Amino acid sequence: MMLFGKISQQLCGLKKLPWSRDSRYFWGWLNAVFNKVDHDRIRDVGPDRAASEWLLRCGAMVRYHGQQRWQKDYNHLPTGPLDKYKIQAIDATDSCIMSIGFDHMEGLQYVEKIRLCKCHYIEDGCLERLSQLENLQKSMLEMEIISCGNVTDKGIIALHHFRNLKYLFLSDLPGVKEKEKIVQAFKTSLPSLELKLDLK
C-alpha cells in the first residue's frame, strides 16, 4: 500500500513536465485507472474510506468531520471503525479526478465543501453527476470552481440542485459565457446563495 502511494504521487508529479502528444494517451489511461470504481471495495470498507482512497490516489485532499487537518497522504489514511471518519470537505486542486470516478461519492452523507481548482478532467458531466447525488444535494454548503477549462454554463447551472448551498465561487472559467444568465438562475433557485464571480 505504501509503495502504491509513493508511486502514484511521483507519477502525478511527472504530469507537469512537457510531453509529446502520444504521452497524453498514457496519462489519460493512467488517470482512468486511478478513477476506476471498485464497488466491492466500497461495500467492504464503506463509502467514506473508499472515496478517500480514490481522492488521494488522484492527488486530492480530504478533511474529516471534527478534524482541522487535511488528509493528503494516501499512505497515512486513518484506520479504525468504518463509521468513524466521515468526509466533510474535499480539495481537489491539481487532481486528476474525472467523471468515471464520481460514483465513489454516491454514499457520502457529510460533505459540506468541495473545491475544484485546476482540474483538467472536470467537465459539465461531472458537475451534473455531482448535483444529482441526493446526499450531496442535502449536505453541500460551499463550492469553489476555479480554472477548470472544460466547464461551461451548462455545468454551472446544474449546481442549483444543491438546495442548501450557501456559497459558490466561480473564477477563471473560459467556457462560461453567460454570466448574467447564471446570476439570474441562482437568484431564482437559491435566493440565499452568496455567489462570487471572477469571470471575464
Swiss-Prot record:
Transit peptide: 1-25
Listed GO biological process terms: ATP biosynthetic process; proton transmembrane transport
InterPro entries: LRR_dom_sf
Residue spans of the LRR repeats: 62-87, 88-116, 117-141, 142-173
Record's keyword terms, sorted: ATP synthesis, CF(0), Hydrogen ion transport, Ion transport, Leucine-rich repeat, Magnesium, Membrane, Metal-binding, Mitochondrion, Mitochondrion inner membrane, Repeat, Transit peptide, Transport
Sequence segments annotated as region (N-terminal domain): 1-61
Subcellular locations according to the entry: Mitochondrion; Mitochondrion inner membrane
Signal peptide range: none
A Gene Ontology cellular-component term: cytoplasm
Residues involved in Mg(2+) binding: 59, 93
GO molecular function: metal ion binding
Subunit structure: Homotetramer. Associates with ATP synthase.
Function text: Involved in regulation of mitochondrial membrane ATP synthase. Necessary for H(+) conduction of ATP synthase. Facilitates energy-driven catalysis of ATP synthesis by blocking a proton leak through an alternative proton exit pathway.
Protein name: ATP synthase subunit s, mitochondrial
Gene assigned in the entry: DMAC2L
